Amino acid sequence: MITGIQITKAANDDLLNSFWLLDSEQGEARCIVAKAGYAEDEVVAVSKLGDIEYREVPVEVKPEVRVEGGQHLNVNVLRRETLEDAVKHPEKYPQLTIRVSGYAVRFNSLTPEQQRDVIARTFTESL
């Protein structure tokens, strides 16, 4: 459990009135702010704080959003043959716009390699 504290009495003057987060499960303390001697976000063993007195301060914990290998979907509504024809005859498709990585881009402005990649990724036989 994480507890927020303000140190009110300590043998080490650098700790006086400093704010910390105590992790009782790990036995660690994370410095939030101190006048001197400790850096912001520095983590030390609680025992390193020595003999201290403190008052608890409320800590608001916001849920952390974690994105781990998320998915991204671009939807292009057209036929494979249209893109293949645009590769062969770009002059026929000057306004052909597709979605690539969340951006709208003119298909003809892509390199031939990028065009082939879009076609390969856009049209699959199965998922």
From Swiss-Prot:
Source organism superkingdom: Bacteria
GO MF terms held by the record: formate C-acetyltransferase activity
GO cellular component, one term: cytosol
Alphabetic keyword roster: Acetylation, Organic radical
Modified residues (N6-acetyllysine): K48, K88, K92
SUPFAM superfamilies found in the cross-reference section: PFL-like glycyl radical enzymes
Function: Acts as a radical domain for damaged PFL and possibly other radical proteins.
Name by which UniProt lists this protein: Autonomous glycyl radical cofactor
